[in-house]
From Swiss-Prot:
Protein name: Peroxisome proliferator-activated receptor alpha
Complex formation: Heterodimer; with RXRA. This heterodimerization is required for DNA binding and transactivation activity. Interacts with NCOA3 coactivator. Interacts with CITED2; the interaction stimulates its transcriptional activity. Also interacts with PPARBP in vitro. Interacts with AKAP13, LPIN1, PRDM16 and coactivator NCOA6. Interacts with ASXL1 and ASXL2. Interacts with PER2. Interacts with SIRT1; the interaction seems to be modulated by NAD(+) levels. Interacts with CRY1 and CRY2.
Cellular component terms (Gene Ontology): nucleus
Keyword Cytoplasm listed: no
Keywords for this protein: Activator, Biological rhythms, DNA-binding, Lipid-binding, Metal-binding, Nucleus, Phosphoprotein, Receptor, Transcription, Transcription regulation, Ubl conjugation, Zinc, Zinc-finger
Organism: Rattus norvegicus (Rat)
Length: 468
């Protein structure tokens, strides 16, 4: 602790050996700070010293961009000296504080030292080097000086100090000139504005590409489905399947190809289960093409691509299936047919349990009132999920999903400005979908074991294998 009753004495010269102590840099820096403050107070005895010059926006972890004020503590300033309060100007208020990085290492700058914005560490390093006339071993590697490694190469660090304009004859400690502050503010605002515009353009471009890929690769989307369900289509209304008789009629026309593979003579529930599988296989093919169009997906290892699709397709299928559903039933056969919810509930066990949970999910999901542009980003985020078992390049995939989720969040804010909780609601749906798929996979295993006629499609067998 500094004896505040005693005058502060100047630093005594240190031998080079003294600098080898692990604590010497911090000790010298702290003592140097005391001397600098003492000299500054002596030079500005008129009382114009202002604490406002030490306010800046924190950029370190945990600061959350809040305003931080570096005040002079008893350990670093003489308590016997009192500074009269001086009203600060508007441009020096905390609200207008600047977030400035050290020109040498990129750490947060504590002020304008030796002619440049520098942190306390680099300020002290430069001061010691000049005062003690230190000579460092030459380094030809042009080391990159950063906060985390700034103490490793002193030669390159000092060279960086000089290259950015640090000078012992320049302003050593104190307030930034008003002209410099105004110029810096203008540069920061211009830079932030340009970066924001550039980022916004990139995000909009990504959202557009994913939306276009969605519309291109899927035969049915929400826009088409809602027109048909609302009865506004110019074509014939969908054929309604509400009992066994209408199911048989539909099998001869709408889904004739699906039931022509040796299942036409089996009972209705088995034929229905077979049709469900055929539609799932077709959607898996569409999802594969959609995934390839997601920027960055094609760069993944092929094994990772397969893993992401294996674990993500059913979550995506049940998401998109919601667009084809209302409380009374769902569209089938590209919107040419409509099968009622009541009919599906009246199928025998366990087939009656296949669709009802999907209707429950769809009613809640549709209540969010998403459009195809929202759903396309949501499906892309589902596919590019970094926590799937067996992935190789987890870090890359997590960054890929993080980017898509960020675009989704901003897109929702723009597309649904009045629903501030839409994004967290949608994230919760990801959790709900996993539970829904788990229950579906368990039901399929039950059907596979108990229904000898209900064979699984080879592609779906591969997807279900070791899934849960």
């Amino acid at each position: 602790m500094v004896d505040t009753e005693s005058p502060i004495c100047p630093l005594s010269p240190l031998e080079a050996d003294d600098l080898e102590s692990p604590l010497s840099e911090e000790f010298l820096q702290e003592m140097g700070n005391i001397q600098e403050i003492s000299q500054s107070l002596g030079e500005e005895s008129s009382g114009s010293f202002s604490f406002a010059d030490y306010q800046y926006l924190g950029s370190c972890p945990g600061s959350e961009g809040s305003v931080i004020t570096d005040t002079l503590s008893p350990a670093s300033s003489p308590s016997s000296v009192s500074c009269p309060a001086v009203p600060t100007s508007t441009d020096e208020s905390p609200g207008n504080a600047l977030n400035i990085e050290c020109r040498i290492c990129g750490d947060k700058a504590s002020g304008y030292h030796y002619g440049v914005h520098a942190c306390e560490g680099c300020k002290g390093f430069f001061r010691r080097t000049i005062r003690l006339k230190l000579a460092y071993d030459k380094c030809d590697r042009s080391c990159k000086i950063q906060k985390k490694n700034r103490n490793k190469c002193q030669y390159c660090r000092f060279h960086k100090c000089l290259s950015v304009g640090m000078s012992h004859n320049a302003i050593r400690f104190g307030r930034m000139p008003r002209s410099e502050k105004a110029k810096l503010k203008a540069e920061i605002l211009t830079c932030e504005h340009d970066l924001k515009d550039s980022e916004t353009a990139d995000l909009k471009s990504l959202a557009k590409r994913i939306h276009e890929a969605y519309l291109k690769n899927f035969n049915m989307n929400k826009v088409k489905a809602r027109v048909i369900l609302a009865g506004k289509t110019s074509n014939n209304p969908p054929f309604v399947i509400h009992d066994m008789e209408t199911l048989c009629m539909a099998e001869k026309t709408l889904v004739a190809k699906m039931v022509a593979n040796g299942v036409e003579n089996k009972e209705a529930e088995v034929r229905f289960f077979h049709c469900c599988q055929c539609m799932s296989v077709e959607t898996v093919t569409e999802l594969t093409e959609f995934a390839k169009a997601i920027p960055g997906f094609a760069n993944l290892d092929l094994n990772d691509q397969v893993t992401l699709l294996k674990y993500g397709v059913y979550e995506a299928i049940f998401t998109m299936l919601s667009s084809l559903m209302n409380k009374d039933g769902m569209l089938i056969a590209y919107g040419n047919g409509f099968i009622t919810r009541e009919f599906l509930k009246n199928l025998r066990k366990p087939f009656c349990d296949i669709m009802e949970p999907k209707f429950d999910f769809a009613m809640k999901f549709n209540a969010l009132e998403l459009d195809d542009s929202d759903i396309s980003l949501f499906v892309a985020a589902i596919i590019c999920c970094g926590d799937r078992p067996g992935l190789l390049n987890i870090g890359y995939i997590e960054k890929l999903q993080e980017g898509i989720v960020h675009v989704l969040k901003l897109h929702l804010q723009s597309n649904h400005p009045d629903d501030t909780f839409l994004f967290p609601k949608l994230l919760q749906k990801m959790v709900d979908l996993r539970q829904l798929v788990t229950e579906h996979a368990q039901l399929v295993q039950v059907i596979k074991k108990t229904e000898s006629d209900a064979a699984l499609h080879p592609l779906l067998q591969e997807i279900y294998r070791d899934m849960y």
